[in-house]
């Protein structure tokens, strides 16, 4: 971490993926002045959530340097947790973001339609945020951009088979 500033990095947002990593994130934000955090439970970890843990997440998300709710969303690549469990906690975490007036960091893999449908149901355009590791096509990108979301496009863009993602990068605004 001490080498970040020398590398030109002034601020880090460390993102929680489950209850344990959200707690670790908060500890890092308290230790380092340049680290901020996102509190949330990744779709692949939603089976760990219940009402008690969600109440704890709500408290954690109100820690001083939490700047987003994430990483949240849907991931249908794996069979577990089941889709209904993921959807339930995606809805709940979107509502938590709205309640706390924080943007979201959305994860969506093999769940394009359901992710977009839930985001529209929850009026996520009022929340804002980023679709991280975006991997869908131009049509889906246009929907998210209309909602005011940023698209996080990673190194997959450099892969030879990333033609649809290259089209997205070409059509998306630079800001």
PLM regions with names:
Residues 1-175:
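Mid-domain alpha/beta scaffold segments of enzyme catalytic cores
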């Amino acid at each position: 971490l001490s080498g970040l500033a020398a590398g030109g990095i002034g601020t880090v947002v460390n993102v929680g993926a489950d209850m344990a990593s959200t707690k670790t994130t908060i500890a890092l934000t308290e230790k380092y002045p340049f680290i901020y955090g996102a509190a949330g439970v990744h779709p692949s970890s939603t089976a760990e959530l219940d009402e008690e843990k969600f109440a704890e997440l709500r408290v954690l998300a109100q820690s001083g340097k939490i700047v987003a709710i994430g990483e949240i969303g849907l991931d249908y690549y794996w069979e577990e947790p089941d889709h209904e469990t993921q959807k339930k906690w995606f809805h709940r975490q979107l509502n938590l973001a709205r309640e706390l007036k924080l943007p979201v960091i959305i994860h969506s893999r093999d769940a394009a339609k359901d992710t977009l449908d839930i985001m529209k149901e929850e009026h996520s355009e009022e929340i804002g945020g980023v679709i991280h590791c975006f991997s869908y096509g131009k049509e889906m990108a246009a929907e998210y951009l209309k909602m005011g979301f940023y698209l996080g496009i990673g190194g997959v863009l450099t892969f030879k088979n990333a033609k649809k993602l290259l089209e997205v990068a070409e059509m998306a605004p630079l800001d």
